[in-house]
């Protein structure tokens, strides 16, 4: 390093001596000489730091304990022994020899018309593998992917001769030689291996850098002991830029070098390598129109602005507009994008062209991913770092959809919105969602990969979010919808245990209803079994038909959202023999005392009818004589005229109360109580009627006594009802009793 730096110092001193001999000595030349030596010194210091870091890492790797990435010291030792024997020749002549001309042809500088490599020797030092590890996941079809930390620092005996033919306008078409006497490469290398079942068993090797590597060369023109032009301020920057572009576009992931091992080991000479340059997935069209309100940077109050941009490894620059603060360029640049996985940030800088160092007039950045979709986005951007200045741009992202249209999986994803729309239309017809619009469900398409098929033809479609039925909550008293009374065959029984609790609750809450229910029970005991069964079945059918639908479910295509209060029918059941189906719940709950008086009157009428029915039953029993000491039971097919002409509403009311009482409907239509209640059936009723009328039929005077007892019972029923209601006056009671006595006198006179 010292000898090379001394060479530069000697050159500077000679130039200064020559200028002073011409009487052109000026402080400005000394200042330029100082800047030149400073830049050269910085370049040498950077190289020295890299060499020292290399030595430190080399020693640290030798002492390091094994971790996730192994140090593979055994491999470095083996390569060090094999390298001077055969590996160096294979690397320089078989691998790099065919590849370097391709690089020179594609990335040669504009000053060179042609470039060829005449000699290449890598030196005695082999590449050093700092660490190695296996990547479990592979993005391609490689069977094995290795990540190696490589560090190659060439020895002093490295030599490479590069012949360059200059262009005629620059060097009159002369040939010159460049000597590469040093090289330093450091970075992470990815190696993908694909195996074969036949010779040579290694089908393909893919090599690339995981990230842009550090690369430095020592280039000397004409002879090997000359000046290193790679450290000169102008040439050094230009050479670094050229090498970085060459590496990033060819050997940095996702671009990689592919080696066909079958052709590589074949005896015939074939082109065994090629560069796998990944095709861009999109292009960005950047249109630079104009700028306004730029900052004056020159002494004349103007500027010479230009725009340069950078997106990844690609750069662009506009032309220079002279002496203006509102330049107009109207230039466009097309930049490729290879992947959307990494951030795509377009960095733009507006500069002022000067003779030595360009000034910065402002910077701005744009995220390209925000403008995807193929639309042209025209915008004015404010320049940062400077308080003034704006830039007029237009950005258009042109995506390459040629391949995506052929992929059936992507087609399915493109039609995802259609699938969501059809799903939403189907679910609205089900009527099970609580809102008009069904929730948006994003379907997931999971491809099923089949060995031997390049394209996937089978997917598993899964909804993105499970949609369950949302039931509307009910307010008010809860009701079990599955405890409905339905018509069943005669050999089956119905259990009405659930209704008993409702009846008990109602009886305890309202004594008026318990009194009315007792009167209806007395009248229903003396009805015929056939008529009782007919009315019972008819009431069951009518109740099942008139039963309300499921309130908590919406009907098909129903759009309103609301709450329906459910109240049991038992809470608002009929209080008289007539049906109250036409009355609404609100009307019954909001009725006043006048309505309660009408209800009390209806109870009295019901009591009167019950008394008539009891008296009519005993009168029919009195007209029959016992035969052979046995009591005769009236056949079920025989019915009286009065019984047939009884009011249907009375019968329906009585039967409905029987249906709501706790018990079971037996095969012959009788009611069988459960719990501590009395067991009542048709035979028991008939026996009770015969026992109660056995002695009365022998003597007519006993009939009169029975009628008196019935009167007393009716009076006691009336008194109990008046006490419970507290709304019946004494006049109404007297009229009612008078009507009952008149009715009894008429019946006795007719007998």
From Swiss-Prot:
Locate the region Disordered.
469-519, 572-751
Q: Which residues form a coiled coil?
A: 701-728
Which residue intervals are annotated with compositional bias (Acidic residues) in the record?
A: 639-651
Which GO molecular function entries does the Swiss-Prot or TrEMBL record give? lipid binding; metal ion binding
Domain of life here? Eukaryota
Q: Which CDD domains match?
A: C2, SMP_SF
Any GO CC annotation of this UniProt entry: membrane
Annotated InterPro entries: C2_dom, C2_domain_sf, Ext_Synaptotagmin/KAHRP-like, SMP_LBD
Principal cellular location given in the protein's record? membrane
Q: Which cofactor does it need?
A: Ca(2+)
Q: How does it sit in the membrane?
A: Multi-pass membrane protein
Which residues are listed for Ca(2+) 2 binding in this entry? Answer: 298, 352, 354, 359
Where is it localised? Membrane
One GO BP: lipid transport
Provide ranges: composition bias, Polar residues. Answer: 483-502
Transmembrane intervals? 2-22, 26-46
Q: Does the keyword Transit peptide apply?
A: no
UniProt keyword list: Calcium, Coiled coil, Lipid transport, Lipid-binding, Membrane, Metal-binding, Transmembrane, Transmembrane helix, Transport
| C2 domain location | 267-381
Q: Which Pfam families match?
A: C2 (PF00168)
Q: Where is the composition biased (Basic and acidic residues)?
A: 472-482, 590-611, 625-634, 664-681, 703-751
Q: Where is the composition biased (Basic residues)?
A: 612-624
**Family per similarity comment:** Belongs to the extended synaptotagmin family.
Name of the protein in question: C2 domain-containing protein At1g53590
Organism, scientific name: Arabidopsis thaliana (Mouse-ear cress)
Q: What is the lineage of its organism?
A: Eukaryota, Viridiplantae, Streptophyta, Embryophyta, Tracheophyta
Q: Which gene encodes it?
A: NTMC2T6.1
């Amino acid at each position: 390093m010292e000898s090379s730096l001394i060479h530069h110092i000697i050159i500077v001193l000679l130039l200064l001596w020559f200028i002073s001999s011409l009487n052109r000595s000026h402080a400005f030349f000394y200042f330029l000489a100082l800047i030149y030596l400073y830049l050269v010194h910085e370049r040498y210091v950077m190289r020295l730091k890299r060499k020292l870091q290399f030595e430190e890492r080399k020693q640290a790797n030798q002492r390091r304990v094994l971790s996730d990435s192994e140090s593979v010291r055994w491999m470095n030792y083996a390569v060090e022994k094999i390298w001077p024997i055969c590996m160096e020749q294979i690397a320089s002549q078989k691998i790099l020899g065919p590849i370097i001309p391709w690089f020179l042809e594609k990335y040669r500088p504009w000053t060179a018309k042609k470039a060829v490599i005449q000699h290449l020797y890598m030196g005695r030092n082999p590449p050093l593998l700092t660490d190695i590890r296996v990547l479990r996941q592979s993005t391609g079809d490689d069977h094995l992917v290795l990540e190696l930390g490589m560090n190659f620092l060439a020895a002093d005996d490295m030599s490479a001769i590069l012949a360059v033919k200059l262009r005629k306008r620059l060097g009159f078409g002369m040939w010159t030689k460049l000597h590469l006497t040093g090289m330093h490469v450091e970075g992470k290398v990815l190696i993908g291996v694909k195996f074969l079942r036949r010779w040579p068993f290694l089908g393909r090797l893919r090599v690339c850098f995981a990230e842009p590597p550090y690369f430095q060369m020592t280039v000397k023109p004409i002879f090997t002991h000359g000046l290193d032009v790679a450290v000169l301020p102008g040439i050094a920057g230009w050479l670094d830029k050229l090498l970085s572009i060459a590496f990033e576009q060819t050997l940095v992931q996702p671009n990689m070098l592919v080696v066909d091992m079958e052709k590589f080991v074949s005896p015939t000479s074939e082109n065994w390598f090629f560069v796998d340059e990944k095709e861009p997935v999109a292009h960005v069209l950047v249109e630079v129109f104009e700028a306004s309100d730029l900052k004056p940077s020159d002494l004349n109050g103007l500027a010479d602005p230009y725009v340069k941009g950078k997106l990844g490894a690609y750069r662009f620059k506009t032309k220079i507009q002279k002496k203006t603060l509102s330049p107009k360029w109207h230039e466009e640049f097309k930049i490729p994008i290879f992947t959307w996985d990494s951030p795509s940030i377009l960095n733009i800088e507006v500069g002022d062209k000067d003779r030595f160092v360009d000034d910065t007039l402002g910077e701005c950045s744009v995220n390209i991913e925000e403008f995807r979709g193929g639309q042209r986005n025209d915008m004015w951007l404010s320049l940062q770092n400077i308080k003034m200045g704006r830039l007029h741009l237009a950005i258009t992202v042109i995506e390459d959809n040629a391949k995506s249209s052929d992929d059936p999986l992507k087609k399915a994803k493109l039609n995802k919105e259609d699938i969501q729309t059809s799903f939403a239309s189907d679910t609205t017809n089900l009527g099970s969602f609580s809102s008009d619009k069904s929730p948006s469900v994003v379907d997931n398409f999971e491809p099923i990969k089949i060995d031997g098929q390049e394209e996937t033809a089978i997917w598993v479609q899964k909804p993105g979010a499970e949609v369950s039925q949302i039931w509307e909550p009910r307010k008010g008293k809860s009701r079990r919808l599955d405890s409905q009374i339905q018509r069943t065959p005669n050999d089956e029984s119905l259990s009405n245990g659930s209704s008993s609790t409702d009846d008990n609750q109602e009886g305890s809450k309202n004594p008026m209803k318990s009194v009315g229910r007792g009167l209806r029970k007395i009248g229903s005991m003396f009805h015929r079994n056939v008529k009782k069964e007919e009315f019972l079945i008819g009431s069951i059918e009518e109740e099942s038909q008139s039963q309300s639908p499921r309130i908590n479910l919406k009907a098909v295509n129903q759009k309103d959202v609301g709450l329906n209060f459910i109240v049991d029918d038992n809470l608002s059941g009929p209080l008289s023999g007539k049906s109250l189906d036409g009355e609404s719940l609100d009307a019954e709950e909001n009725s006043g005392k006048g309505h309660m008086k009408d209800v009390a009157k209806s109870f009295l009428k019901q009591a009167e009818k019950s008394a008539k029915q009891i008296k009519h039953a005993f009168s029919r029993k009195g007209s029959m004589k016992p035969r052979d000491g046995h009591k005769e039971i009236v056949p079920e097919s025989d019915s009286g005229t009065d019984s047939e002409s009884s009011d249907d509403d009375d019968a329906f009311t009585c039967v409905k109360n029987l249906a709501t009482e706790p018990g079971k409907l037996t095969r012959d239509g009788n009611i069988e109580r459960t719990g501590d209640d009395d067991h009542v059936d048709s035979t028991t009723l008939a026996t009770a009627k015969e026992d109660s009328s056995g002695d009365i039929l022998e003597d007519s005077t006993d009939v009169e006594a029975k009628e008196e007892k019935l009167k007393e019972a009716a009076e006691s029923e009336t008194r109990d009802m008046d006490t419970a209601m507290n709304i019946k006056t004494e006049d109404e009671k007297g009229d009612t009793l008078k009507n009952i006595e008149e009715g009894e006198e008429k019946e006795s006179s007719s007998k």
